[in-house]
Amino acid sequence: MTNFLYLPEQLKQIFLSVNALLPEVLLSTSFLFMIMIDLILYHNQQNKGKMIKIITKSSQIIFFFCLLSVVVILNQIAQQFYISNDLFLFDRMLVLDLKAVVFKFLIVLSTILLLAHIYVTKKELVAEFYPILISMVIGLCLMTMSVNLLMIYLSIEIVSVSSYILTTIDKTRKSTESGLKYILFGASASAVMLYGMSLLYGMTGTLDITSPDFSRGISQIDSVASTVAIVLTISGFLFKISASPFHVWTPDVYESAPTPVVAFFSIAPKIAGFLVAIRFYAAVPNNLQTITAVLAMASITFGNFSALWQNNAKRLLAYSTIAHSGFMLIGLVTMSQLGLTSVVFYLIVTLFTNMAAFLLVDFAEPAFVGVFSNNLPKPYSSLLEKTPAKAESDSSLLEKTPTKEKITNTQFLIPNFSGLGRLNPFYGIMMLIVMISLAGIPPTAGFFAKLNIFSALWETYQNTNQPILLWLFIFGLLNTAISLFFYLKIPFYLFFKEPLENQSFELNSKQYFLAIILVLPILILFFKADWLMDLISYL
């Protein structure tokens, strides 16, 4: 009888929870809409032409639903800002608070920028791309709200499975190989994280990280055993933010996956992953300062030193994201208000900087392909118009000339950027601004992003006098100086090298507009960084 009376209350709570998840409902609607179109029209040859037209409109459909989600999220931000009332959903599996809605806004914003990237570069993607992308976005949004270990695991797996598919969406040998590596490393990280979570559940008797029983249970267990369980658990978070030692998949995936997808990978999982890490670090009583400091130093050092030897722009940016994850981990080392505020500021700056960097790299692709095809004999240049699968059937030519897949593996080599800044000064200036922001040089927002992180670290060191913090501070400064050598490599080729033979490079008005939209905040946030820091302080 009690269970029967309790059932209406459970249903009421479920309905209230669904109402609070309106952005996710909108995204799920767009997901189902795209799936239904694909299922209905894919096998109908008479509708083949209609299918092609609908696919070309797919990004616009998703764009519309993302804009609706942004409107709803902005309304939720306003409500949370004035009410400041955390709303627990689905029996404390999720929480809707100001942090969650702000981070969801950043994720959906990055999705909109991804769709804009695809639109202005006229990327031709398969129909399955858009529903898979939306499923990944839904998983990321759930990650931002997850406060239950089971929900954290499920949302991370939703993101991971979607990421694996998006990596191999091109169906080339290179993307398949990198996708397989991604799956293997992801499965390993997932297994380790799940084992750590099971240990924590055994120690505490609860999966709710906001429950007092969770912290109390960990504190009553031997510190070595609890620390091992915690470290195993955070391995999954490190995998999603591309931090050492779970970064090995990053360079290959970034090199082979479509550039718009890589741009999204470089920031969206980090946004969700760092919020999950912040919630988890706040819940555990153990002092993880030393462990996190070592992870930060490893990520920064490995990312920067590996980038020094890279000759491919996308691989260079991949190692750059590893290093930036290390810098953001410094905020978790401090676990101070300034440190956590600095992490959010860093994420926002990185959103615009990384999206701009990959967009500008992608803009140069037609110039590279044009040069290669113009310099090939006619029988070979015609082969470039074929897909890799069709090209492989012509074995006599395949052995002697590059296919599109082979060109893709070499077209983003940094020497291929030679002289593009001379051919298009606007492009060169935009790329220069983005690169010096990644390096942390004024007058860009990247300077204040690193300055805030180092300020928080120095403040924590003065309060605790922990030697590991001083070493982390020194390592961070030295690596920032080292990073100048590879971040300025592309601008050097843009302006100080002669253009390649028969090369032309022009952008259209839409490409100029999107580049300005992404680069302008990088400059504005240098002069008005206090505006954003003041807003973030309310989180």
Label each region the model flagged.
Residues 1-539:
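Alpha-helical transmembrane segments of multi-pass membrane proteins predominantly involved
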